[in-house]
């Protein structure tokens, strides 16, 4: 995203769940080290995680979170059991807080981690800090295969979005496109509306990302 509070982390989490549901072996990496939220969404502990890996204190195979970690974590077990494809999703949380975020993101250890994960997973999805807030996203942009911007309609100015795009292009990022968040639709019908609601209503709110998915997938039998 260009700025904070655009629903970026929620959309990233939804994308990871979508890929897992489609049968893709998916790794979600929490690389927003300054304001991490992914671990909270999935009811996980932030430690041990990415920073522990990059500082040489742990191996990714040891700290990756699986469906078992989700089951024993803070999420509703019934919701998890009704979540299709959850076994295909692994998560690397942010890890312990660090002061040298920029140094860590520029490290060869991160390059090595990406290289190893590409051999093991069908898709790797990364959540990182907003482009205009700190240099983290620009730093990471040439380390990944593609970048997607999240733009919250009505909150962030188009000028800021344009500057974010310019900064990424200058860094040789492969900009794949923009997800428009907070769009309201008068007619939300059927399968297409299911996806539309995700991206229209996503915001970084408290609560379980799994429970929100369960409602969208028809897991809530109250209606």
Where are the regions a protein language model picked out?
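P-loop NTP-binding module
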Residues: 1-223
